[in-house]
């Protein structure tokens, strides 16, 4: 059964408002705080039930009781974690996983699933990176929207989190994310915007941190002006658990529900604030209406007696894990390993896999498969031996290393399972380095000396350094692949599944190479986002730095040729409200079927502002049989060419030449089409502090700009330079230099200085009149 998540939202809101109007102030305040850890309050006299919310992003984590924080939970399918799902670049798959999560929530009588987490992976050191999709906002947003639509198609709400600018665990409840407006709007908000516009989640969860000094849970600009005003969010805002600072200010800002419940503590504060006139009755009623509307929507979608097929969900988890596996290295085409070869399977993770992260997302899995057992099933017990090599924490001994090397030497292929132990990455703390445990590195190097045919399989939630990479032939990134990850790994290693995953984050050579290295995680209560918009590949590609593995990268057991590109036009009027299409043809020129993630990036040749070298603007995944060729179509609009102009608080497009580059990763873009884009600044918010150059292009022309230049007595700059035949080349060059310097002086002048610089010719009243005309 599919339930439309947005069926008659106005009717639901109207019914909720009518119900709230019948409530006392005390009852309204009661709704604004949870009943224990996981339930909302009900109001029996009005027939308003209580609903249940539960973690988490990759599997249901329902506590046996709402009075418990969730240290134990009912069994549920543990799907692959967010990085693995994002590496699939498959929105249809995310919808399937979301729908399965929705079915499990319905069966467990859970009305809202607390996910997905879509914070940007600003640094590989982020302790909670295993819960987040990507370093790129488009990939994060599209994965999230598909997941949301899947969950909510089953009549269960989602909670997109953590809003916003929440990319670290260190001092996570007290640190201020200090960020400029352009970076906020270009990097850290778009994933949430896409999720809201394309998925309309039932709830959004505010973050623990402060944003530029204001707690996210009481940030009016984020929760009301942007989320509800600019994006049209129709749902309810809930705090992160324990994330309330000043409850009254939170209600004023648009934070509807406090979780977990605080008893009468904050309820009494709200009631007192209303009675004393510090909080309006309308603000209280609005928040209570948000909670009530959520409850009514959930009650209408509830399916008593719902159940799910655990084996079908396990099979889906296996398929999802397989699509997210990324083949990073395959020297001499060592992979896939033909069945019949002798394998030495090494490492504790081979038998006791790390398949999910730690913290609030921890799922109690229905079952767990491991790669060793799955490889034995495929290759036969006589062809597979195991050596511990190192324990689950990555510690080793000389005897363990000797045993591993000996068994590797007697095999045809050695497979070392390594990665990050739970103690290295978890909710609650950030990583100190991107290095793997030293014992694991020792193990890889010892096995490499004994067996040249070595494959390393990584189980980790974010990027790791690989100083050993040139000593091994194969590297397989399997992430934290969920309860069925072991089977998926075996299928990829044996060739039963052709790997099609692509990295959703850059793997740097070292932590010192990362853009956040000087800033992360911050100090003295402040996290400085000093790298600006240059996050992930935007930084590496702009700086011409070679990472270990680039964003969007992933190998296959087949080969793909990018055979053609064509745009619907070589000119695009960005202000015309239309769009432009780009057709891309790709052919499978290998011997086996495979899937390719086709990625489109935009590059501006001569930007008026500093911009990243390239930015992802579209992607799709194609399945191709050997010899098969397909053409897909991308559609781009104004926003895809725009940058956020903080001075005008608007998305702006400058006229110029743009390249649309297409290929299989951010560093492999063989196809390109070039177009001229006609544009101008967006709707500007001009003030006395605006610069003269900010008046260019207003109303489609430069009349305002010309008026300002003439007011300074420099109207001759608006005319072509007079270059006569009798002038020498040196005189012409000197004149051009002088004009450029004068233009720069004029353009950079704040208009509030014009009355003085014009010696009074440009009066204050004239300036005010021009500002009024420019704003009209």
Q: Which residues does each predicted region cover?
A:
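Glycoside hydrolase catalytic-domain context in secreted enzymes
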Residues: 1-642, 657-658, 666
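Polar/charged alpha-helical tracts
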Residues: 18-22, 272-276, 301, 377, ...
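Residue-level signal for threonine
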Residues: 370, 691, 750
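A general structural signal for short secondary-structure boundary/capping elements
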Residues: 388-393, 521-526, 628, 680-682, ...
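In a subset of proteins, long, contiguous C-terminal domains/tails are tracked
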Residues: 556-557, 593, 624-626, 664-678, ...
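Terminal connector regions
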Residues: 637-684, 763
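Low-complexity, Pro/Ser/Thr- and charge-rich linker/hinge segments at domain boundaries
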Residues: 677-697
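Conserved, compact domain cores that house catalytic/ligand-binding motifs in diverse enzymes
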Residues: 696-769
């Amino acid at each position: 059964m599919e339930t439309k998540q947005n069926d008659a939202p106005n009717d639901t809101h109207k019914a909720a408002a009518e119900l709230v109007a019948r409530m006392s102030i005390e009852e309204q305040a009661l709704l604004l705080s949870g009943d224990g850890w996981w339930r909302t309050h009900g109001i029996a006299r009005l027939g308003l039930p209580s609903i249940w919310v539960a973690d988490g992003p990759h599997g249901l984590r329902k506590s046996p009781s709402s009075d418990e924080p969730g240290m134990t939970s009912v069994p549920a399918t543990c799907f692959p974690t967010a990085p693995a799902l994002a590496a699939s670049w498959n929105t249809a798959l995310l919808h399937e996983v979301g729908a399965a999560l929705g079915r499990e929530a319905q069966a467990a009588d859970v009305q809202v699933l607390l996910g997905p987490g879509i914070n940007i992976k600003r640094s590989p050191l982020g302790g909670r990176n295993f819960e987040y999709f990507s370093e790129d906002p488009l990939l994060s947003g599209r994965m999230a929207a598909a997941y949301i639509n899947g969950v909510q198609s089953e009549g269960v709400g989602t909670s997109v989190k953590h809003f916003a600018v929440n990319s670290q665990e260190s001092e996570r409840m007290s640190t201020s994310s200090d960020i400029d407006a352009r970076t906020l709007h270009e990097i850290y908000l778009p994933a949430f915007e896409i999720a809201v516009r394309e998925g309309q989640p039932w709830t959004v969860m505010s973050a623990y941190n402060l944003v530029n000094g204001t707690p996210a849970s009481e940030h009016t600009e984020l929760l009301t002006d942007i989320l509800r005003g600019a994006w049209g969010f129709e749902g309810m805002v809930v705090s992160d658990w324990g994330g309330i600072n000043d409850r009254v200010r939170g209600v004023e800002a648009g934070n509807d529900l406090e979780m977990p419940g605080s008893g009468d503590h904050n309820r009494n504060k709200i009631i007192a604030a209303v009675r004393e006139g510090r909080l309006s009755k309308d603000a209280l009623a609005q928040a209570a209406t948000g909670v009530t509307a959520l409850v009514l929507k959930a009650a209408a979608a509830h399916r008593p007696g719902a159940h799910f097929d655990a084996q079908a969900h396990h099979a889906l988890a296996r398929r999802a894990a397989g699509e997210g596996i990324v083949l990073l290295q395959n020297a001499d085409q060592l992979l896939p390993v033909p069945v019949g070869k002798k394998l030495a399977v090494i490492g504790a993770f081979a038998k006791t896999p790390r398949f999910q992260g730690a913290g609030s997302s921890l799922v109690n899995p229905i079952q767990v498969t491991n790669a060793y057992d799955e490889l034995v099933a495929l290759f036969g017990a006589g062809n597979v031996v195991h050596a511990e090599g190192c324990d689950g924490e990555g510690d080793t001994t000389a005897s363990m290393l000797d045993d591993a090397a000996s068994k590797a030497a007697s095999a045809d292929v050695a497979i070392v399972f390594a990665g990050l132990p739970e103690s290295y990455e978890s909710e609650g703390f950030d990583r100190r380095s991107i290095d793997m445990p030293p014992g694991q590195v020792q193990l890889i190097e010892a096995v490499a000396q004994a067996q040249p045919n070595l494959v390393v399989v990584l189980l980790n939630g974010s990027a790791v350094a690989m100083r050993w990479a040139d000593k091994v032939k194969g590297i397989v990134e399997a992430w934290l692949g969920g309860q069925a990850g072991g089977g998926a790994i075996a299928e990829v290693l044996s060739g039963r599944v052709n790997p099609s995953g692509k990295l959703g984050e850059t793997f740097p050579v070292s932590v010192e190479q990362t853009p956040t290295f000087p800033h992360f995680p911050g100090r003295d209560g402040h996290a400085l986002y000093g790298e600006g918009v240059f996050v992930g590949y935007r930084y590496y590609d702009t700086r011409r730095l070679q990472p270990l593995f680039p964003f969007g990268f992933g190998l296959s057991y087949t080969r793909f040729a990018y055979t053609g590109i064509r745009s619907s036009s070589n000119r695009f009027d960005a202000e015309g409200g239309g769009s432009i299409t780009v057709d891309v043809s790709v052919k499978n020129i290998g011997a086996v079927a495979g899937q390719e993630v086709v990625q489109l990036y935009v590059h501006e040749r001569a930007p008026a502002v500093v911009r990243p070298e390239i930015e992802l603007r579209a992607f799709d995944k194609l399945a191709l049989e050997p010899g098969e060729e397909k053409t897909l179509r991308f559609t781009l609009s104004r926003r895809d060419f725009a940058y956020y102009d903080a001075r005008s608080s608007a998305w702006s497009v400058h006229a110029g030449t743009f390249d649309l580059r297409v290929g299989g990763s951010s560093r492999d873009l063989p196809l390109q089409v070039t177009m001229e884009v006609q544009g101008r600044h967006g709707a500007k918010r001009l003030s006395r502090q605006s610069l003269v150059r900010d008046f260019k292009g207003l109303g489609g022309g430069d009349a305002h700009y010309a008026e300002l230049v003439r007011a300074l007595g420099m109207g001759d700059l608006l005319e072509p330079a007079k270059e006569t035949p009798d002038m020498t080349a040196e005189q012409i060059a000197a004149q051009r230099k002088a004009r450029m310097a004068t233009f720069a002086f004029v353009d950079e002048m704040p208009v509030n200085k014009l009355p003085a610089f014009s010696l009074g010719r440009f009066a204050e009243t004239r300036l005010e009149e021009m500002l009024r005309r420019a704003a009209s």
